[in-house]
């Protein structure tokens, strides 16, 4: 237990102190199984991101690890690669358990695990609310090596004894700050009580509020602490522009003009409210643009269909709210449009960090009214980045 550890006291800007600084700057030098390495490259990775360079090896070595990193830094692949490296494909039982705050994120993690583990003959099942319990029970009886899910459903499955814990080696908590702020603390503590004492714990969180630190002191043994600072986040490779729009009402015409100029392979358009998402969807549909929309008011099944269509490329433009910024990870997104600038600067990275992840190129275009200029300057300062006026030849850049 690390409860007396100075580094775990909350620091004013809620950052942990790193106690580990070894870097492995290529996947080849991580001594991964050949079939896993093949999956990593097939997925489209070329070189590890900042968090992957630091965290994969200590996790694979069996240390408890706390990693503080924002969305869009490659953390899903960090723990997916680590778990795949550690598990035994011949043992048909859950060896790595991953909990996440939302269904979308859980499904996203499942897709990444399956894609990277494509050549390994492993199974990964997602246990999430809003689906039939019987389906989960049947899938878990097959003994998938990795199970990912939301805390409520995972806890339920362990209690029903269909999710067996006796072979579990790793317990991974993704977006721990989000999970605890959504009121899952008790369920997470209950899950911990049901796991073998020897289970390795890996916790990932964008911020380190007191309740997250409490989890780390209670359940982690002498953890390796890794902080990926804000400036290491990947706004690299993403060209950021703004279009000055005199009035809010003119944004729609601006967007239509942009549609005419640019061939969009795939784009996400962010608005700040659900109502605005619906309004914009109606307006664009009326102008014969094909768009789909997604926000938190929708039924789970409906959201799944929309995400599926978007991932497969049959729908090209997705209009969404911040709530879902964390759950959208589509490799082909070449363009992110902030129809509204985010209400807080932290969400900027969640939104546009999608566009050019891990060295993939992307373009972000911000619609900025006079009222937004201050926020845009704050965003530039916060991320030490430059948002330039959109050039005439923007079509060549996308």
Swiss-Prot record:
Principal location listed in the UniProt entry: cytoplasm
Motif Q motif per UniProt: ranges: 25-53
Gene Ontology biological-process entries: cytoplasmic translational initiation
InterPro entries reported in the protein's UniProt record: DEAD/DEAH_box_helicase_dom (IPR011545), EIF4A_DEADc (IPR044728), Helicase_ATP-bd (IPR014001), Helicase_C-like (IPR001650), P-loop_NTPase (IPR027417), RNA-helicase_DEAD-box_CS (IPR000629), RNA_helicase_DEAD_Q_motif (IPR014014)
Entry's free-text remark on domains: The Q motif is unique to and characteristic of the DEAD box family of RNA helicases and controls ATP binding and hydrolysis.
The family this protein is said to belong to: Belongs to the DEAD box helicase family. eIF4A subfamily.
The protein, known as: ATP-dependent RNA helicase eIF4A
Gene this chain is encoded by: tif1
């Amino acid at each position: 237990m690390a409860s007396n550890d100075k580094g775990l006291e909350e620091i004013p800007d809620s950052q942990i102190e790193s106690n580990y600084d070894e870097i492995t700057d290529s996947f080849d030098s991580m001594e991964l199984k050949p079939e896993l390495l093949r999956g990593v490259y097939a997925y489209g990775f070329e070189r590890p991101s900042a968090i992957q360079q630091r965290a994969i090896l200590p996790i694979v070595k069996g240390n408890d690890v706390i990693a503080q990193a924002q969305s869009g830094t490659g953390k899903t692949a960090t723990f997916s690669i680590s778990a795949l490296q550690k598990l035994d494909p011949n043992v048909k039982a859950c060896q790595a358990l991953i909990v996440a705050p939302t269904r979308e994120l859980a499904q996203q993690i499942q897709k990444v695990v399956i894609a990277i583990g494509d050549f390994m003959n492993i199974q990964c099942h997602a246990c999430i609310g809003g689906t039939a319990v019987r389906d989960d029970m049947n899938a878990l009886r097959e003994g998938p090596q990795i199970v990912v899910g939301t805390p409520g459903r995972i806890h339920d499955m362990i209690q029903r004894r269909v999710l067996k814990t006796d072979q579990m080696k790793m317990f991974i908590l993704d977006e721990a700050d989000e999970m605890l702020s959504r009121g899952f603390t008790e369920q997470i503590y209950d899950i911990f009580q049901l796991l073998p004492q020897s289970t390795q714990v890996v916790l990932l969180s964008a911020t380190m509020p007191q309740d997250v630190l409490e989890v780390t002191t209670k359940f982690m043994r002498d953890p390796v602490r890794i902080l990926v600072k804000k400036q290491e986040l990947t706004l690299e490779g993403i060209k950021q522009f703004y279009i000055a729009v005199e009035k809010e009402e003119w944004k729609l015409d601006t967007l239509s003009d942009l549609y005419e100029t640019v061939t969009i392979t795939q784009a996400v358009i962010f608005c700040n409210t659900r109502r605005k998402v619906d309004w914009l969807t109606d307006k664009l549909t009326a102008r014969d643009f094909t768009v789909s929309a997604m926000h938190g008011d929708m039924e789970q099944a409906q959201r799944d269909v929309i995400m599926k269509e978007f991932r497969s490329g049959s729908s090209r433009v997705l209009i969404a709210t911040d709530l879902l910024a964390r759950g959208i990870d589509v490799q082909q997104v070449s363009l992110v449009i902030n129809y509204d600038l985010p209400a807080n600067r932290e969400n900027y990275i969640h939104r546009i960090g999608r566009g050019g992840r891990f060295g993939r190129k992307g373009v972000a275009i911000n619609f900025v009214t006079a009222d937004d200029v201050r926020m845009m300057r704050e965003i530039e300062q916060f991320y030490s980045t430059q948002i330039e006026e959109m050039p005439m030849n923007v079509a060549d850049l996308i």
